[in-house]
Amino acid sequence: GLGDVYKRQVSPMVWQVGEAEGFVPETRAMRTRVVSLIAAKNKGREIKLGAGGLRDVEFTAQLLQLVHGRQDESLRVRATLPALRALAAGGYISRGAAERLKEAYRLERVMEHRVQMFRLRRTHLLPDDEDGLRRLARAVGLRTADEVRRVWTATSKAVLRAHGQVFYSPVVEAVALSLIHIS
């Protein structure tokens, strides 16, 4: 149908974005800007946009997809978890890093959804009160508010570590630049 025709016409443009001069540094700067805009009081509670949160997993997967997806069509998937699987299968990210990112992504998504259910509105902040944290603990299979804090801290640190190793790797920028000059 018409939608398929449109997708076929637009797809090459999507996968050529990684060929733009300065694409990798601009993408990195965009992520830094997003984190810098978080209010200081919310920095350690921002599940979606904060350092080590959902966006770090998504930016990591999408950057690698856009850099390598020009050449490798197996990376042209829409969702984050399948993207991480494809990136690991293609050798663009270690299987261990992909598994850690997938596990963290699933947990952070569940936490985000549970918090939204409790508040009956879109929010991406961990509760800042003991009752809210205990309620979240029960909703995600943990026992205490302290356990939520520990798990959140460990998870966000693991994401930040993997994100830093991949997203800021000089190899990613070098590959992007080499593909620009080959194209």
Residue ranges: model-predicted function:
Residues G1-L179, S183:
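A nucleotide- and high-energy phosphate-metabolite-utilizing enzyme signature
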